[in-house]
Amino acid sequence: MKFWLQGCAFVGCLLLTLPCCAARRRASGENLQQTRPIAAANLQWESYAEALEHSKQDHKPICLFFTGSDWCMWCIKMQDQILQSSEFKHFAGVHLHMVEVDFPQKNHQPEEQRQKNQELKAQYKVTGFPELVFIDAEGKQLARMGFEPGGGAAYVSKVKSALKLR
């Protein structure tokens, strides 16, 4: 009888703490949403040919984003933590032409696009993902970077330094 009462008391205590844990979890989730910055406009992706043409006109560098969008964990982190940050989107909108060079495993990609992406991967000697390769309008490499933790603002600072931008 003594053990039965102790067991009931223990289970009762556990049941009483569940609402507190759930409320704490909800509150922390709400706080995360409230502190997340409002996203800037989406990145403007261009084809490689379009980016070269536009870069010849406005002299902005081209950023080739080599990614495995549906299987590469670090590519997905880079997309979420850096490329989709308001700081990076603003910077890219002002200073870059963005080209996604994707190597999906699950999602369908037209054969022509797959071949073009393979050519770009070979041309710029990309051996791992994710990788950003910055080029000029002539296709000359200016800089290259992979994923780095720290978020969009820190990454933009490193890109500016690598490209010698203010």
UniProtKB/Swiss-Prot annotation:
Disulfide-bonded cysteines: 72-75
Transmembrane segments: none
Xref: InterPro entries: AGR/TXD, DsbH, Thioredoxin-like_fold, Thioredoxin-like_sf, Thioredoxin_domain
Pfam families according to UniProt: Thioredoxin_2
Keyword Oxidoreductase: yes
A GO term, aspect molecular function: oxidoreductase activity
Residues annotated as domain Thioredoxin: 32-166
Job of this protein: Catalyzes the reduction of disulfide bonds. May function in reducing intermolecular disulfides between proteins and small molecules in the periplasm, or keeping a specific subset of periplasmic proteins reduced, or maintaining the periplasm of Chlamydia in a generally reducing state. Seems to be unable to oxidize thiols into disulfides and does not display disulfide bond isomerase activity.
Protein name, UniProt field: Disulfide bond reductase DsbH
